[in-house]
Amino acid sequence: MGVLDIAKGMGVTLGKLFQKPLTVSYPEQRATLQPRFRGRHVLTRHPDTGLEKCIGCSLCAAACPAYAIYVEAAENDPRDPVSPGERYAKVYEINMLRCIFCGLCEEACPTGAVVLGNEFEMADYRSRDFVYGKEDMLVGVTGSRPQRREALSAGRPVRLGFQVEGGPRAELEGVEYP
C-alpha cells in the first residue's frame, strides 16, 4: 500500500465531504414518503353509507404469510347492518409485531377494506399494545386522527393506500390521493 493509494482514499473522503448528506435529522426533519409506502393497516368505511367495508371473508388472513391477521366473522343484522354484506368482521385483529408489511392482505381484500396507510410511528412499551383491534384500525374515508392532523399541518389531503398511475382504484373510491 503506497502513498498513492492513501491519497486516492483521502480524495474520495474529501469529495464526499462537500456533498449533501443522505441522513435526515428525524424527528425535526421528515423525509417524504414514497407513493407505494406501506405503513400501519387501516380498515375503511363506505363513503356514502358509513358502513364498514370489511365483510369478514378472511381472505386477508389467508393471504398473510406471517399469520399476523385474525378475523372472526358474524352474521349481519338486516335491521342494523354493520357492513353491506351478509357477514361482517366481529373480531379483526392484527399483530403488528408479526406483520412484514408485504401488502398481500391489501391485494387479497375483495372490497378494498384493508389499506396499508402511511403511518409508521408505532412505538410502544408493551408488546400487547401492538395487537390492534378493529376499533383501533377502523377509519372513515378521511383517514385516522393522526393522519388527518399530519395532513392538515402539511396542507395536503389525507393519503390512504397507493396509486401507481391513473385515478383511484374502485375499491378506494372516495379516498383522496395526493
Curated annotation (Swiss-Prot):
GO terms for cellular component: plasma membrane. This is NADH-quinone oxidoreductase subunit I. Signal peptide: none annotated. Its main location: membrane. Its EC number is 7.1.1.-. Keywords: 4Fe-4S, Cell membrane, Iron, Iron-sulfur, Membrane, Metal-binding, NAD, Quinone, Repeat, Translocase, Ubiquinone. It is a peripheral membrane protein. GO terms for biological process: aerobic respiration. HAMAP family: NDH1_NuoI. The gene is nuoI. It is an enzyme of class 7 (translocase). It catalyses: a quinone + NADH + 5 H(+)(in) = a quinol + NAD(+) + 4 H(+)(out). Residues 45-74, 90-119 form the 4Fe-4S ferredoxin-type domain. InterPro entries: 4Fe4S_Fe-S-bd, 4Fe4S_Fe_S_CS, NADH_quinone_OxRdtase_chainI. It comes from Deinococcus radiodurans (strain ATCC 13939 / DSM 20539 / JCM 16871 / CCUG 27074 / LMG 4051 / NBRC 15346 / NCIMB 9279 / VKM B-1422 / R1). Binds 2 [4Fe-4S] clusters per subunit. Its cofactor is [4Fe-4S] cluster. Disulfide bonds: none annotated.
